[in-house]
Amino acid sequence: MRFHSFLIKYGEIGIKGKNRYLFEDALVRQIRFALKDVDGEFNVHKAQGRVYVDCEGEYDYEETVESLKRVFGIVGICPVVRLQDNGFEQLKKDVEKYIGEVYPEKNQTFKIEARRSRKSYPLNSMELNCELGGVILDAYPEMKVDVHNPQIRLNVEVREEIYLYSEIIPGPGGMPVGTNGSAMLLLSGGIDSPVAGYMIAKRGVALEATYF
């Protein structure tokens, strides 16, 4: 299964009120900087309160994920399969294929979590949950629905395109570097000063280091 995009989840940035866009813009800049030396072409952008990394053409998946895992401000990284909207019948086939390729065991519990941002889509979120859940049960009878603690949580987001994702890779959290001023870090040669530097950088402080 080829993942075409990454959905970036953030934490504290989401409670910043009217200044939220400043923190989102800083996160986008930091992601672009982290990916500048990674093989591949990437389009990092915001859309409807989300941050996405769209992968144009071939790219190094492992290197991309490792680079994103080092960006402060990212709470989770979701590899996304991005689909053209070719009708609901095609979506059912795509969901069946996604489960078949990503989860070869086909005996786990699952839950569908649909989100319909494009209100013109003919089915609402609850109808998508029910219909797509039925598709998986028909295709893979050993799988069971568990709405409370599923092993697989398949997210289906209906936008101009359709996004499928089920994995959340943990990020470092914190705030994007540069959103909370700057400071000088004295590196004395012990372990405590780099640890302190990491922790303060995680709070969004841009650091300059000095040695003696």
PLM feature segments, named:
Residues 190:
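Conserved G/P- and acidic residue-centered "switch" motifs that form tight phosphate/ATP-binding loops
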Residues 1-184, 194-212:
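RNA-binding accessory domains that recognize and position tRNA/RNA substrates
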